[in-house]
A protein has these predicted regions:
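Pre-Walker A (P-loop) beta-loop-beta motif of ABC nucleotide-binding domains
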Residues: 22-33
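The feature captures the beta-strand-to-loop junction immediately N-terminal to the Walker
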Residues: 35-37
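Conserved ABC transporter NBD signature motif
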Residues: 58-69
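ABC ATPase nucleotide-binding domains
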Residues: 76-82, 86, 90-233
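Glycine/charge-rich catalytic "coupling/switch" loops of P-loop NTPases
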Residues: 255-305, 329-352
Length: 352
């Protein structure tokens, strides 16, 4: 049985549908990221799950019981969920220990159990040596750990996280990504994590839910959404792909600027119709001197390049601009005429 189920969940504001009839099921212990650009509806979805917003339509279920419907709504305090906000929202006048223990105090947990649970969480979040300090004496990463420990103190079934790392610098974000996932695996609760950051989603999630304009575009593992995007939006948003406009000739062949390409996977529009293909930057070959170029090659010229240590990125004009990642030792001057070879089995058709 799914731990969390959203059925036809909808939220409207004047002039806009923020969340548009989405369906989603999340299993016990799963880590799911809601990923998308600003305004796509991901935070609104999270706030409806938490009970801070009431849906206009649809239902929310937890462990088979309906907690939100058009006729009845379970209040937030009875949902056995915890939420971590972008601002952390820890109490500045309380010590680390007092902050972590506050939810247990509100639940009137016995003193001995409270101390035991707080001690365990302080150890798990590596805050045991900071227990008597105040938030103003902590780094941003330590404050985030306090928010995590406090959220876990009531032993929630579901942990909701709303852009929790956006206020941290890049190095701390990297550390905290692994820390959040480590705690998830240790305590085995269900996590719903909202982010606009593709790297966060790819490194943390069991599954990624990609949202756009209030709707779910694609659901899949990090590998699935990266390797097999089902739309032009997903391919562009996840990144690492070239998206090119082509004309479908028939079968698995397309026309790119007057040159035929075989496409190994994906969906295709009707013959003669315009469509898109996507191909990863590392799945395209740059041939400075191809001789007889062979199949699935198109001519182009180098517009620009960037040396990035481990590789070089080339921008090549093939009637459209394409980005190609090649080994660092491959050096081709700007303006050079080249051939670009597309690996058919790595090219994906996008009918929409």
């Amino acid at each position: 049985m799914a731990n969390l189920a959203l059925r036809n969940l909808t939220k409207r504001y004047p002039g806009v549908v923020s969340v548009d009839a989405i369906d989603l099921t999340v299993d016990h212990g799963e880590f799911v990221c809601l990923l998308g650009p600003s305004g796509c509806g991901k935070t609104t979805t999270l706030r409806m799950i938490a009970g801070f917003l009431e849906p206009d339509e649809g239902e929310i279920g937890v462990d088979g019981a309906t907690i939100s419907s058009p006729t009845a709504v379970v209040p937030p305090e009875r949902r056995n969920m915890s939420m971590i906000f972008q601002s952390y929202a820890i109490w500045p006048h309380m010590t680390v220990r007092q902050n972590v223990g506050y939810p247990l105090k509100m639940k009137k947990i016995a003193a001995a159990e409270k101390r035991s649970r707080v001690d365990a969480l302080l150890a798990a979040t590596k805050l045991d040596t900071q227990a008597e300090r105040y938030p103003s004496e902590l780094s941003g990463g330590q404050q985030q750990r306090v928010a995590l420990a406090r959220a876990l103190a009531p032993k929630p079934d579901i942990l909701l996280l709303d852009e929790p790392l956006s206020n941290l610098d890049a190095s701390l974000r990297g550390d905290m990504r692994f820390e959040i996932r480590r705690l998830h695996d240790k305590f085995q609760y269900t996590s719903i994590y909202v982010t606009h950051d593709q790297v966060e989603a790819m490194t943390m999630a069991d599954r990624i839910v990609i949202m756009n304009a209030g709707r779910i575009e694609q659901i899949g593992t990090p590998e699935e959404v990266y390797e097999r995007p089902n739309s032009e939006f997903v391919a562009r948003f996840i990144g690492g792909s070239n998206v090119l406009k082509v004309k479908h000739i028939g079968g698995r062949q397309v026309d790119l600027g007057g040159h035929l390409l075989d496409i190994g996977q994906g969906e295709f529009a009707g013959s003669g119709s315009s469509m898109s293909i996507c191909v990863k930057t590392h799945d395209v070959e740059l041939l400075a001197d191809a001789g007889a170029p062979g199949n699935n090659t198109v001519p182009g010229f180098v517009r620009s390049q960037a040396y990035l240590g481990s590789h070089r990125d080339y921008v090549v004009d093939v009637s459209q601009e394409i980005l190609i990642a090649v080994p660092a030792h491959v050096a081709v001057p700007n303006g050079s005429r080249v051939w670009v070879r597309f690996k058919a089995d790595r090219c994906r058709g996008l009918a929409h």
